[in-house]
Amino acid sequence: MTHPPLHLRSSNVLLVIAGGIFGTLARFGLESAIPTLHGWPLPTLVINLAGAFLLGVLLEALLRRGADQGVRRTIRLAVGTGFMGAFTTYSTLATEAVQLGASNQLGGAVVYAVLSLLGGVLASTAGIWAASIHHRRTSARRTGARAAAEANR
């Protein structure tokens, strides 16, 4: 008996849906808590930049812990694809940029779009960097602790 491809397995689809529900709720909560700034869609900008950073952290941390299988795959699907996919909202970014342009704020629309897209790349890169640094530090501590334990034998 052959198994369906990973993206068609009901358990994986349910992980993404469950994560997506919580990501949507988190986005809604932050959108409600963060005010717009003189008509500027600050909530979406903050959410997308935070999501890009956190996705970079998550994927780098998972990658450094091993192959994409078992618990790591479950976390990636539920948190990375589901939660972060629903939490970030580039369709809203596009809609808000068009709305800014339509309300005679063309410069603001361009700045918003560029800041969001370039900022997203920089935020995800910063997340990857932060997770990488954390991994190196914790690995060095573990290695040092093992060496100290062996020296005390």
Set out the residue ranges of the language-model regions:
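Membrane-interface helix-loop junctions in multi-pass transporters/channels
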Residues: M1-R153
